[in-house]
Regions:
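Carbohydrate-recognition beta-sandwich/jelly-roll modules
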Residues: 1-130
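Active-site-proximal substrate-binding groove within the catalytic cores of carbohydrate-active enzymes
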Residues: 57-58, 62, 291-520, 525, ...
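Disordered, acidic Ser/Thr/Pro-rich linker "stalks" and the adjacent N-terminal cap
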Residues: 432-439, 446-455, 621, 641-669
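Solvent-exposed beta-strand/loop surfaces of large extracellular or lumenal domains
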Residues: 27, 31-38, 503-529, 587-598
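Short, surface-exposed alpha-helix to beta-strand junction/turn motifs within ectodomains of secreted
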Residues: 566-594, 619, 633-637
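Surface-exposed, short loops/turns at beta-strand junctions within beta-sandwich domains
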Residues: 606-612
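Acidic, Ser/Thr/Gly/Pro-rich low-complexity segments and short DxT(G/T)-type signature motifs
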Residues: 550-557, 617-647
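Aromatic- and carboxylate-enriched substrate-binding clefts and catalytic-loop regions
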Residues: 135-379
């Protein structure tokens, strides 16, 4: 409801912010302009004692209320200072990347296709230079929702397996006969962590059945009001805590996708939770106090297990209060579909997807005015998977690049990649993804401070994001419409630029240009207070980098290799542009082009002989700030890229220093 989703927000009064550190507090400013912050408990001292909410000497202490002074009465400044306070009490949430199985096979996952997807994704990531994922995640489809005694439905074999639920709780279906052991071991072998989806309310397909299974077993209750599990029942939260602890102990789970909580308060007084209060607030307070205890217990267990990057992602039906960040790392944006499209002039998939989700950001920030850091929003992007999306072969490499980079300027720390490996095989998308993730992580200290500029794209308006950290900035701009439009903004504190930039020169570099037709005068300079007006073509997107420091370092060649008898690949330490002119000694160059991720130059030559050494020279390249790249290097072509081969001990130098053994003898050894 509108009432529940607005709970736990701060109040701004002139140059101050006020609020309660419990995220389910009612905060409002009434018609007389009086601000109220109300915490609803409804508990007797006996109940407080039962729920371990009294001090050791029998006293009750309420949640803390906070008041803070900001540097200005300007709302943007108050918000920035309030977020600084939130950051000081929040659990640490660094830039994070992980792979999730959902849009690959949705609920039809099993041991085999999870193993296949994980292996293919890791291979693609590692071969394109991506650091190990923080987590590989198994989404919904592992739980057994089947029970003939509580449901009259036929077993859904593909999604839930063939057997009945026998424990009366969350349990593995027979598609996962060894639990998460194969998947978690595989993730560990990649140098990554392992993540798990759990739907507290029972998921979204069998929530009623799961609620009845749990109630029949005595581990919780079925909520008839919402047709799902009663997530506030203390028996359920206690049993779920035990289940989570077992998972962390057994599989070192470092990510919990907690998908779906209470949509309405349960009014059944026979359930093990509070009822009553204004709008059922006794229920909501009691529910979230129980879950906060669960979060704290799991974090303590994570420390015991050496899990140093445990992440809680709270998804649907969670009011976006910034005070949840004391325990959780990210919260679903709430006002959006998982995947949505809106067409406002451009009908390409990249345009429809960006216009929809960015429109939801404008609704969240500008219309509803939720005070929640954009860095901690879970937005369900990027999605480029085969199931339920109709996205296969629907993005060119340039569109995929634009999709990722524009999303990056929203500022989120949390990158859960909803990919299918065969779709990332299209074109050069592995390399584009790798370059993007490297850029986003490197610039996260800037991107996380994103502010919206322009107006909502779902009405066809120009818009973008402005991100700043000290003397560095990144600004994105996009025109979603079918006509030429302008975007204007002032480079000042309202878009996040620090006032300390006054009088200083900012060097501007183009990071992305999509559908740009005019010849940009690049490497320009701008200053604080300048009014920036940009003319954008239909569907055009641009991203600028701004800094007081000027880049004067030329691109450096980091790798040169012959990948085939007619192909030479040159890799640079940064993105390069231009039209390469190349020569290869003893061979003709028939084609020279910059790769889609702009980190490589690919040369096609006449046939090279095995073992031949050639000299490669390339000119006509520069980095994004205009520094020229000079390439003059030697490359040796080795057939099938085999440098040396040994088939017997006698083929080796110092053969006496080598011990022959077998795989069996090495088993269990490091």
């Amino acid at each position: 409801s509108g009432y529940v989703i607005s709970l736990g927000q701060p109040v701004y009064i002139q140059g101050m912010f006020l609020g309660c550190e419990f995220p389910m507090t009612e905060t409002e400013i009434d018609s007389n302009k009086n601000a109220h912050m109300r915490y609803f408990s409804g508990k007797t001292f006996e109940k407080l004692q039962e729920d371990n909410q009294l001090t050791t000497d029998g006293k009750y202490v309420t949640w803390q209320t906070v008041a803070g002074a900001a540097r200005s009465t300007d709302m943007n400044v108050i918000q920035s200072d309030f977020y600084e306070y939130i950051n000081s009490i929040a659990t640490r949430s660094d830039f994070r990347t992980q792979y999730n199985s959902w849009y690959d096979n949705m609920m039809t996952i099993n041991d085999d296709n999870i193993e296949s997807a994980f292996k293919k994704m890791e291979k693609g990531f590692s071969e394109s230079g991506v650091e190990p994922m923080d987590s590989y995640v198994v989404d919904d489809g592992w739980n057994n929702y089947n029970n003939s005694n509580t449901t009259s439905t036929v077993h859904d074999v593909a999604r839930c397996g063939t057997t009945d639920n026998v424990t009366g709780f969350w349990e593995f279906n027979n598609k996962f006969p060894n639990g998460f052991r194969p998947a978690s071991d595989l993730a560990e072998s990649f140098g990554s962590g392992f993540g798990v989806w759990v739907g507290p309310r029972g998921g979204y397909n069998y929530n009623a059945a799961m609620g009845k299974i749990i109630e029949k077993a005595g581990f919780g209750a079925y909520n008839a009001v919402t047709d799902d599990i009663d997530v506030g029942d203390r028996r359920y939260v206690t049993k779920l805590t035990e289940f989570f602890l077992q998972m962390q102990d057994a599989y070192k789970v470092n990510y919990w996708k907690l998908d779906g909580f209470a949509t309405k308060p349960c009014t059944n007084a026979n359930h093990k939770h509070m009822t009553g209060g204004k709008n059922g607030m006794y229920y909501f307070s009691d529910t979230w106090e129980a879950w906060i205890d669960l979060f704290e217990t799991l974090r303590t267990n994570a420390e015991k297990n050496g899990i140093d990057n445990l992440w809680f992602n709270l998804t649907c039906y969670v009011n976006p209060s910034p005070w949840y960040l004391q325990w959780a790392n990210s919260i679903w944006i709430q006002n959006s579909q998982d995947i949505g499209r809106v067409q406002v002039g451009q009908n390409r998939q990249v345009d429809q997807l960006l216009s929809y989700r960015d429109g939801r950001y404008f609704d969240f920030v500008k219309e509803r005015e939720f005070q929640f850091p954009l860095a901690n929003i879970y937005n369900h992007d990027p999605i480029y998977g085969k199931t339920g999306t109709n996205l296969a072969n629907q993005m060119t490499d340039d569109e995929f690049k634009t999709y990722l980079y524009m999303m990056g300027t929203r500022g989120t720390a949390f990158w859960e990649l909803y990919y299918s490996p065969e779709m990332i095989d299209e074109g050069q998308k592995w390399d584009i993804n790798a370059e993007y993730l490297e850029w986003a992580k490197k610039n996260y200290h800037i991107l996380k401070n994103a502010k919206l500029i322009g107006t909502t794209p779902d009405k066809g308006n120009t818009y973008g994001y402005s991100c700043w950290d000290g003397e560095e900035g990144i600004i994105s701009m996009r025109n979603p419409s079918a006509s030429v439009k302008t975007l204007s903004f002032t480079l000042d504190r309202n878009v996040g630029a620090a006032e300390s930039l006054k009088g200083k020169t900012l060097n501007r570099t183009t990071i992305l240009d999509h559908k740009t037709t005019d010849a940009q005068t690049d490497y320009q300079t701008v200053k604080y207070g300048d009014v920036i007006t940009v003319t954008l073509q239909p569907g055009e997107a641009r991203i600028w980098s701004l800094s007081t420091a000027k880049d004067t370092k030329a691109p450096q060649l980091t790798l040169a290799k012959a990948t085939a008898d007619n192909t030479i690949e040159l890799t640079f330490d940064e993105r390069v542009t231009g039209t390469p002119a190349a020569t290869v000694s003893g061979a003709n160059v028939t084609k020279a082009e910059v790769s889609a991720n702009q980190r490589k130059v690919m040369l096609t030559t006449s046939t090279l002989s095995a073992g031949s050494k050639v000299t490669v020279s390339v000119s006509g390249l520069k980095d994004l700030t205009g520094n020229a790249a000079a390439v003059n290097t030697e490359v040796v072509y080795q057939e099938n890229q085999v440098v040396a081969k040994a088939s017997a001990k006698t083929d080796l130098k110092n053969a006496n220093d080598v011990t022959e053994t077998t795989d069996e003898a090495l088993a269990g050894k490091t």
